[in-house]
Amino acid sequence: MPIGNNKDNDGTTLNISGLTISDKSSSTSSNNNTTTTTTQTSEPYVPPSRRNKMNNSSGSSRDDYPSPSDRDNRDSPFNRDRRDDGYRGGNNFRENNSNNNNNSRDNYKSPSFSRNNNSNGGGSSSGSGGWDNGPREQGPPRGNSYSYSPNNSFSRGGNQGGYGNRGGSGSSFGKPANKNDRYYDRWSNFRDSRNHPEMKREFIDLEEHKAEEIFKKNDDNIGIDFNAYDDDDISIETSEHICAPLNSFADVDLGDVLLGNIKHAKYTKPTPVQKSALPIILKNRDLMACAQTGSGKTAAFLFPIISGILLDGAPEAPPAYKPGVPRAACPRALVLAPTRELAQQIFDEANKFSYGSPVSSVVIYGGAEVFHQINELDRGCDILVATTGRLVDLLMRGRVSLSKIKYLVLDEADRMLDMGFEPQIRQIISEFDMPGCRDRQTLMFSATFPKQIQNLAADFLYNYIFLKVGVVGTTQNITQRIEYVVEEDKNSYLLDYLSGLKSDGLCLIFVETKRSCDTLTYFLNQRNFPTTCIHGDLTQPERENALQSFRSFATPFLVATDIASRGLHIGNVNLVINFDLPTDIHIYVHRIGRTGRAGKKGLAISFFNEKNKPVGAELLKLMKASNQDIPDWFEKMVHNLRMSKGPSNSKSNSPFNKSYNSHHNRDDNRGGYGGGGGGNGGYSNNRNDRREDKSDYSMHHPYFSNNGGSYN
């Protein structure tokens, strides 16, 4: 209790447990070797449990609680935190006091409350919580807000009915915090040596652990001997010769930063598609490139894009901030991909090769949290890698603008059309603010280019060059084998084959349906083959975890549907098994292309039976074109199919047989076999239609005119 001049305290000295207290003066005396201290009692008595608190805090006493009115303000609905729906005042506030870890009630220290009738909303709009270091920014008055500052080191602003952000922080009106300030700062401090020769940078070899972390995260192309591509048998055809192919990356000036990253990634020589595509793209020409899978198409378009962005320098300043109006990201390069996995992979490569530069890359795709992707866009974006659906969504929201696009890339373009994305592609290019084909550079890459893709190129590419490298769609580095296995014996045959497998690489097994994917994965795991799976019903985190487990050899067997057949660069895949053959030969091409990548040898085994007859003829043709060993039984089976006649041997309404009969009518130059009102005779007309389509397309590009309209 406080000690003062009253009836219990008349000014005399009191001795409490050896402590002498007086209200007059301070002195020190010694009696019987005992030291007593006399102190002035101008301050109230403080218990021992509070002394440590007073020494380490600016609080004056235990009784220094906020007034009742302030405590009422603490419970005001305007002081709610939207993140956890709790109150910021009272006991919900937890003080972080590094000098005192005692959690007793005596250690409670109240924040100081103040009412501000001219609130600006306070705080930073970029933070995720409700706290903001430093003073609030001043802005125009809006409503009433309550703020409190424990130890005067924090402040939080909220506004009544205002523009509070997700996470509980208020919005500032006068000078909003800009998330991409660092982005523009990086660009303002960067000078490209091609524009500023005095800024010439020497190649600096990174420390081993840092290079391992940055450039070997995706080790698909690390250590690969690209000399395996230097084969005179590899043909390179272009519709127009404008420059000689490259012999090394140093033949063109890509900039010091990019050339250094290429060395760090141990890219010693360009692959054939890179040799021809790089100079064409650097000449600012549109390109439609067809090259074998795993030949380095991703680097072929990323290198010129990163180099061009660095040469152009800092982007234009964003438009002025308007309250309530979202600020759109304005990328300079857009890469469209058919799947999330391929988009993520391209993004990783873009990050790797733009290391040490201000170039910023962002990836957006469906199945992931859209608010996180919007946050990334707000931090600045030069290269945007996207799937079509999520991009259309953000374009409609006004969070992305295509007005500054200088480079447009369609990767695995035929796959996007196969998946039904053509309307979205046309919408993105034509219905939003993307520059016209004469004002941007458009690049299309894929392993196959059927007629539908050629028409798309004719619509969106301007004065383009067609590039074809090697065997279209497949590679001679892959050994293809075909085995006759009936449906009932597939599991046991697969088990016997894997049991005798001596390879230390990865094995990728393709099936037709999602149910088969789960069933076969369970079957192999039960028999001690570590297996994971990937298909369309899995969430994006589940897909990423499965791919990471496969890449890291934790589960060296991956069962997948065709979602994994396109564009995925997974190193060390030595074996691909077509447990279920596809009905489209182009899908087969991309499936087996997951092995034999970048100069390595690979093996592809396919299980064939009566169910797969419709694709047999195309498969035989493809195997012959790549000089594969063909079993006699397979060749005889396909020959017998060709010799079969009449509607009794085929169902004219079957889509598979339509494709099959159409193929043979073209090869044999035959008419229809009659019957069914001339139903089969219609295939001869399809052949003529196909010729007319070729002739029509030959008007779009001289290459197809000179080659009879064929891209093979």
Swiss-Prot record:
Q: What CDD domains does the record point to?
A: DEADc_DDX3_DDX4 (cd17967), SF2_C_DEAD (cd18787)
Q: Start and end of every Helicase C-terminal domain?
A: 477-638
Sequence ranges of Low complexity compositional bias: 25-42, 90-119, 140-157, 644-662
Chain intervals for the UniProt region annotation (Disordered): 1-183, 644-712
Q: Record's Gene Ontology CC terms? A: cytoplasm; nucleus
Keywords of this entry: ATP-binding, Cytoplasm, Helicase, Hydrolase, Initiation factor, Nucleotide-binding, Protein biosynthesis, RNA-binding
Q: Record's family?
A: Belongs to the DEAD box helicase family. DDX3/DED1 subfamily.
Protein name as catalogued: Probable ATP-dependent RNA helicase ddx3
Q: Which organism is it from?
A: Dictyostelium discoideum (Social amoeba)
Gene this protein is translated from: ddx3
